[in-house]
Design a protein with these regions (language model features):
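Short, solvent-exposed loop/turn segments at secondary-structure junctions
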Residues: 99, 134-135, 176-179, 257-258, ...
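Charged, compositionally biased non-catalytic regions
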Residues: 55-81
C-alpha cells in the first residue's frame, strides 16, 4: 500500500496537470475569441467603409446633379461652388469685357480690360460673383436664395468668412462691384431693389417678403428681405440668372479700398492677395468745405481734391463722434481746382466725369480709417443705387443693415 505522502504527491501532480490543461484550454479559447473578434471588427470596418464610400458617392452624385441642374437651367450663367465647409454657393459667371465696348464714352473710362478682370496685370477670362448675399451656414456662410442675409458682421469678419471658404475665395472687391455696375448701365438694365421697406421706391408694386412679415412700405420694424426674392428687375441684368440685391436691402462690405484720413487708397487691380499696407495711395482726397469738428451732423458735401485741407475730426480718430460729409449723388461732387482726374477711380465709380451715370449718394468721414459699403439698404430710397458709397464707418463697425457677398476666382 502507498503511503499517505505518496497519495498527496500524486494528487499534486494530477492537480498540476489539470491546471496546465485548463490554462492551455483557456489560451486556446482566448486565441479563438480574439480571432473571432478580429474577424468581427474587420467585417464591421469593411461594412462601415463600404457605407461611407457609397454615402460619399451619393453625396457627390447629388451635389454634382445640383450643380449641373443650376448650370443647365441658367444656360451656364450660374454655377454652384462648394466650399471647404461643404456649403453650397450659387455663383454668377461674369465674363471679361473691354471698357471701350461698353460705349460709355461720356464717362471717360479709357480702354482695355476692366481691372476687375486683372490680377497683378494678368487678365482673367471670367470671375464668379455670389448671386445672392451671403447667409449663415454650418461653420461659415453660404450663397443661396430665399433666406435672410447674414448681417451685423464687421469688415474683418466678412472678409474672413469669405477666405475661410478655401483657396480663390475672397470678399467682393470694389473692382468687381464697379464692373458689374458699368455693365448694367451699358446694357440698360440698372437694377432697382428693396429701397423702401420691402418694396422699390421707384415702382412700389415691386416687392419681396420682409424678415418681420411686415407690409411693403411699412416703416416700422425691419424691412430687410430674403435673398433673391424680388423680381428680376432687382437683378443686374433684369433676368432670373443675374446678381441679386445689389441695390437696397442691405449695404455690402467691399474689399480693396479704404479711406485713410480722407485719402483714397485702393489696389491697382483685382488682387485680394495684396496686403492692405501695400494698397496704392492715390493723390485723391475727400476734402471738406469746413473744418467744423463740433457735433456729429453733416459738414456739407465732400470735395474731391489733391489734399485734405479741412478735416471734420482729429487725424487717425476712427470714431463716429464728429461731423461727416454727404452728397445726394457721388458723381455730382465738386472737384478742387488742383485735383488731377484719376482714370482708375472713374473705373471704380468713385470719381465721375459726368452725372449721367448710375445713381447713389456718397457719405464719408475724412478722419481715421474708413471702409466702404455700397448699394444702400431697405430704407434709403433715392439715396440707394449702384453708385451709392458710404465711407462713414471704421472696419470694426457692424450693423443689421450691412452684409457681404463672396466672390471666387476660377
Amino acid at each position: 500500500m502507498s503511503s499517505i505522502a505518496e497519495e498527496i504527491a500524486g494528487l499534486k501532480v494530477a492537480s498540476a496537470a489539470q491546471t496546465a490543461a485548463s490554462q492551455a484550454l483557456s489560451q486556446e479559447v482566448a486565441g479563438k475569441m480574439a480571432a473571432i473578434d478580429k474577424k468581427t471588427n474587420d467585417s464591421i470596418v469593411k461594412v462601415e467603409s463600404t457605407y461611407d464610400q457609397k454615402a460619399a458617392g451619393l453625396t457627390i452624385i447629388a451635389t454634382d446633379g445640383y450643380k449641373k441642374a443650376i448650370e443647365h437651367n441658367s444656360g451656364g450663367r450660374n454655377t454652384v461652388v462648394y466650399d471647404v465647409q461643404g456649403n453650397p454657393n450659387i455663383m454668377c459667371v461674369i465674363p471679361r469685357f473691354n471698357i471701350e465696348d461698353l460705349g460709355l464714352v461720356d464717362l471717360n473710362l479709357g480702354t482695355g480690360v476692366h481691372p476687375a478682370f486683372q490680377t497683378n496685370g494678368v487678365p482673367r477670362v471670367e470671375i464668379l460673383v455670389g448671386k445672392y448675399l451671403a447667409s449663415s451656414a454650418t461653420n461659415g456662410s453660404a450663397v443661396i436664395g430665399g433666406v435672410q442675409p447674414l448681417t451685423a458682421v464687421n469688415y474683418d469678419v466678412a472678409k474672413e468668412l469669405c477666405t475661410r471658404k478655401g483657396a480663390n475665395w475672397h470678399l467682393m472687391s470694389v473692382h468687381e462691384w464697379a464692373a458689374i455696375a458699368l455693365w448694367s448701365l451699358a446694357n440698360g438694365t440698372v437694377p432697382r431693389g428693396n429701397t423702401n421697406y420691402g418694396r422699390s421706391h421707384e415702382k412700389k408694386w415691386e416687392t419681396a417678403s420682409r424678415s418681420d412679415n411686415g407690409a411693403p412700405g411699412d416703416v416700422s420694424g425691419t424691412g430687410r428681405t430674403d435673398t433673391g426674392k424680388g423680381p428680376s428687375t432687382w437683378n443686374y441684368d433684369h433676368t432670373h440668372f443675374g446678381v441679386c440685391d445689389l441695390v437696397g436691402n442691405v449695404w455690402e462690405w467691399l474689399d480693396q479700398m479704404k479711406l485713410d484720413n480722407g485719402q483714397i487708397i485702393t489696389t491697382l487691380d483685382n488682387n485680394p492677395a495684396v496686403a492692405e499696407a501695400n494698397w496704392h495711395k492715390h493723390a485723391a482726397y475727400f476734402d471738406s468745405p469746413t473744418d467744423n469738428q463740433t457735433g456729429a451732423g453733416s459738414a456739407g458735401a465732400p470735395i474731391l481734391s489733391n489734399a485734405a485741407t479741412k478735416r471734420n475730426g482729429p487725424m487717425n480718430d476712427d470714431s463716429n463722434d464728429y461731423p461727416h460729409l454727404t452728397a445726394s449723388h457721388f458723381a455730382a461732387i465738386t472737384k478742387a481746382a488742383g485735383y488731377v482726374p484719376n482714370e482708375l477711380l472713374r473705373k471704380l465709380l468713385i470719381e465721375s466725369a459726368t452725372t449721367a451715370t448710375v445713381v447713389g449718394y456718397i457719405g464719408a468721414r475724412n478722419y481715421g480709417d474708413r471702409f466702404p459699403v455700397r448699394g444702400g439698404s431697405w430704407g434709403h430710397g433715392t439715396s440707394a443705387g449702384l453708385g451709392a458709397l458710404s465711407l462713414y464707418n471704421p472696419r470694426s463697425f457692424a450693423g443689421g443693415d450691412i452684409g457681404f457677398r463672396p466672390a471666387f476666382f476660377v
